[in-house]
């Protein structure tokens, strides 16, 4: 049997050897993309089936009311979704708002009047709204909520078609102070992404975060769902990356009309079982531009899971197998993907193209190779091209840039996937 002193010395030596040995490198682990803190919907969750379909992708919602049903409220509380009560007009119920906040103390915001410069909505002049505003401010202070301004659109109220004119007069009223307001709420239905982006800029003059609390392409009405998809992709790319936009809410997940009827903006199907529409799949899986995410390359990284891009005006589509892909990836465009690599294997690209297409692939900002993609049988049959590029293991940024031709881009992965 070893003497106690001998065992003690051996133990000390073992500790010293461990301390003095070279550090064994720890390989980075993949991290998922977090859901967007901005993304939300304007919708009354009446069907319980809708909740698990949308809640993984949204951080907030409102229904134009003072509260919401108990089933939705419980689901929101347990799935990190913020419900915002609203004072739609001057006839709101303080008691309902008060009770909801007391029962759900994580409530953070109160929304102001809805489209006061529209005669079929709240229908208030700036002076009329200002008369009622101190009550709203007092309620937010009592409940320790942040206040969001009245939600403005181009209007039908005589003399106040321009939302800026309405806001300027409202904020000039003696009962109103910008200091009481956390954010500016606006609505937009212009079908041009450029027009919408310029519209957002108009409201930056107030120096407050902007909440786009209703939007979709509706004026003019899009001719098909693909036009609505193109609009959605462009404006979500913009708002997710625009630091002045704090939140946005899609109008709306479901209406009483048919899913395949104009303006083609529904995210959820009717009937049973309820499912996401193709537009809903794009909305819920759209990039949150989470720079902390490194997705596992071995499992495949979807073309839609980029964290940076050149040109916000891209198009996403949904294949028959529900895979989301970039439609018509054109010369001059690029996408950046943050990936985690666990094995040294060649990079693969899944795609379709019927023209000669040339790409440049970068790893961590360094060009690795020019890739010539062979033509595929057609635009529906997906091909996998194995490159000669073997990215190092760990966390890296891969850029795919189109140099010539166009192609439909599905995903990147490596040869360990299938």
Model-predicted regions and their roles:
Residues 82-84, 242, 251-300, 304:
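Aromatic-rich peripheral "rim/lid" segments of glycoside hydrolase catalytic domains that contact
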Residues 37-110:
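N-terminal carbohydrate-binding/catalytic regions of secreted carbohydrate-active enzymes
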Residues 149, 154-159, 205-232, 250-269:
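Active-site clefts of carbohydrate-active enzymes
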Residues 17-35:
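Bacterial Sec-dependent N-terminal signal peptides
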Residues 104-126, 147-158, 179-188, 212, ...:
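Active-site groove signature of glycoside hydrolases
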Residues 63, 85, 114, 164-220, ...:
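Aromatic- and acid-rich polysaccharide-binding/catalytic face
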Residues 291-418:
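Extracytoplasmic
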Residues 1-9:
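Bacterial N-terminal signal peptides that target proteins for export
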């Amino acid at each position: 049997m070893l003497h106690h002193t001998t065992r003690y010395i051996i133990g000390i030596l073992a500790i010293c050897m461990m301390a003095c040995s070279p550090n064994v490198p720890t390989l980075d682990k993949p991290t998922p993309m977090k859901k967007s803190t901005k993304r939300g919907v304007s919708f009354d969750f009446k069907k319980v089936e809708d909740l698990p379909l949308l809640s993984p992708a949204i951080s907030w919602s409102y229904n134009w009311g003072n509260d919401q049903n108990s089933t939705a409220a419980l689901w929101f509380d347990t799935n990190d979704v913020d419900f915002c009560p609203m004072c739609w007009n001057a006839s709101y119920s303080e008691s309902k708002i008060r009770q909801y906040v007391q029962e759900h103390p994580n409530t953070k915001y109160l929304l102001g009047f809805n489209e006061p410069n529209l005669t079929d909505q709240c229908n208030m002049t700036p002076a009329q709204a200002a008369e009622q505003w101190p009550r709203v401010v007092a309620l937010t202070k009592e409940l320790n909520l942040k206040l969001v301004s009245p939600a403005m659109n181009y209007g039908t109220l005589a003399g106040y078609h321009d939302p800026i004119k309405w806001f300027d007069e409202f904020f000039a009223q003696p009962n109103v102070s910008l200091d009481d307001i956390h954010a500016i709420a606006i609505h937009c239905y212009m079908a041009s992404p450029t027009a919408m982006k310029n519209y957002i800029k108009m409201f930056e003059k107030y120096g407050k975060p902007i909440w786009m609390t209703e939007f979709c392409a509706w004026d003019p009405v899009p001719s098909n769902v693909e036009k609505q998809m193109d609009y959605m992709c462009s404006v979500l790319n913009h708002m997710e990356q625009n630091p002045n936009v704090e939140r946005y809410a899609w109008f709306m997940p479901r209406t009483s009309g048919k899913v395949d009827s104009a303006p083609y903006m529904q995210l959820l199907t009717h009937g049973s079982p309820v499912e996401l529409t193709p537009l809903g799949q794009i909305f819920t899986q759209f990039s949150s531009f989470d720079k902390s995410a490194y997705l596992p390359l071995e499992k495949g990284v979807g073309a839609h899971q980029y964290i940076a891009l050149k040109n916000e005006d891209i198009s996403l589509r949904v294949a028959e197998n529900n895979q989301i892909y970039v439609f018509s990836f054109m010369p001059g465009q690029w996408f950046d993907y943050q990936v985690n690599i666990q094995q040294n294997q060649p990079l693969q690209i899944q795609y379709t193209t019927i023209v000669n297409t040339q790409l440049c692939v970068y790893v961590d900002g360094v060009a690795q190779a020019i890739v010539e993609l062979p033509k595929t049988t057609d635009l529906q049959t997906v091909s996998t091209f194995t490159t000669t590029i073997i990215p190092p293991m760990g966390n890296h940024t891969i850029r795919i840039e189109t140099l010539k031709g166009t192609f439909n881009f599905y995903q990147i992965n490596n040869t360990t996937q299938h």
